[in-house]
């Protein structure tokens, strides 16, 4: 991963311990700064007033908190991008996630290349937005 990717924090809120360990290990192996949250309240405190971050969560967390999880996260960090780890048979959950502007839903087996590609795409999008802001400031 490049230097700009390392600046974007990855927040992990995953109920399945095996999947959580896998994602945290994936972040470590790729020099990504990852932070885990014990629950939604802790996550909201960590992301509050951030301009951007990646949040990786699984369907267990969404099932535990319901659809309000999306609004809580969006209010705390409007610039955060969510990646949802879910199963293909959870179409209702996927539909709900899309309706709440989740960046992507990733299906098992949560391949390393797929997770990293999503993170890279988010970082590229953030970088482009930052460049546009800089350009607008120069125009003024």
Language model: regions and residue ranges:
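Conserved phosphotransfer microenvironments
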Residues: 20, 53-75, 90
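C-terminal output helix
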Residues: 92, 110-119
């Amino acid at each position: 991963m490049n230097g700009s990717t390392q600046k974007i924090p990855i927040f992990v809120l995953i109920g399945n311990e095996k999947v959580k360990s896998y994602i945290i290990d994936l972040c470590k192996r790729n020099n990504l700064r990852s932070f885990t949250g014990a629950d939604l309240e802790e996550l909201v405190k960590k992301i509050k007033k951030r301009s951007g971050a990646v949040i990786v969560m699984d369907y267990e967390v969404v099932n535990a908190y319901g659809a309000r999880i999306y609004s809580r996260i969006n209010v705390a960090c409007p610039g955060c991008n969510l990646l949802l780890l879910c199963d293909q048979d959870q179409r209702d959950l996927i539909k709900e996630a899309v309706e709440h502007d989740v960046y992507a839903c990733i299906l098992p087996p949560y391949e390393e290349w797929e997770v990293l590609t999503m993170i890279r795409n988010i970082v590229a999008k953030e970088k482009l937005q930052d460049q546009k802001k800089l350009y607008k400031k120069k125009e003024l």
